[in-house]
Swiss-Prot record:
This is Co-chaperonin GroES. Heptamer of 7 subunits arranged in a ring. Interacts with the chaperonin GroEL. It is found in: Cytoplasm. Together with the chaperonin GroEL, plays an essential role in assisting protein folding. The GroEL-GroES system forms a nano-cage that allows encapsulation of the non-native substrate proteins and provides a physical environment optimized to promote and accelerate protein folding. GroES binds to the apical surface of the GroEL ring, thereby capping the opening of the GroEL channel. Keywords: Chaperone, Cytoplasm. It comes from Picosynechococcus sp. (strain ATCC 27264 / PCC 7002 / PR-6) (Agmenellum quadruplicatum). Belongs to the GroES chaperonin family. The keyword Cytoplasm applies. Coiled coil: none annotated. The keyword Disulfide bond does not apply.
Length: 103
């Protein structure tokens, strides 16, 4: 299988999906202990890098997505599809899996 190159800036999610760059997980505890990868929790916060056009309604119109590119969001722990591109971690979420925006 040939590897393909995807430019994140040209990626456009479909429907009400949101593409999020995952924030880095904590490298050490509050007490200063370094955590191995196996002990790190999956981050649940990230920055929106692309947004779909919104969910299509029965009449054919679209419901706008409530978040925009650049928003920091908190999302469900087991939500979405994890994607790794150019060494960075991303998650493709449905809008309903986003719990809150972070100021």
């Amino acid at each position: 299988m040939a590897a393909i190159s995807i430019n994140v800036s040209t990626l456009k999610p479909l429907g009400d999906r949101v593409f999020v760059k995952v924030s880095e997980s904590e490298e050490k505890t509050a007490g200063g202990i370094l955590l191995p990868d196996s002990a790190k929790e999956k981050p649940q916060i990230g920055e929106v890098v692309a947004v779909g056009e919104g969910k299509r309604n029965d009449d054919g119109s679209r419901s706008a997505v409530d978040v925009k590119v650049g928003d920091k969001v908190l999302y469900s722990k087991y939500a979405g599809t994890d994607i790794k591109l150019s060494g960075d971690d991303y998650v493709l979420l449905s809008e309903k899996d986003i719990l809150a925006t972070v100021a």
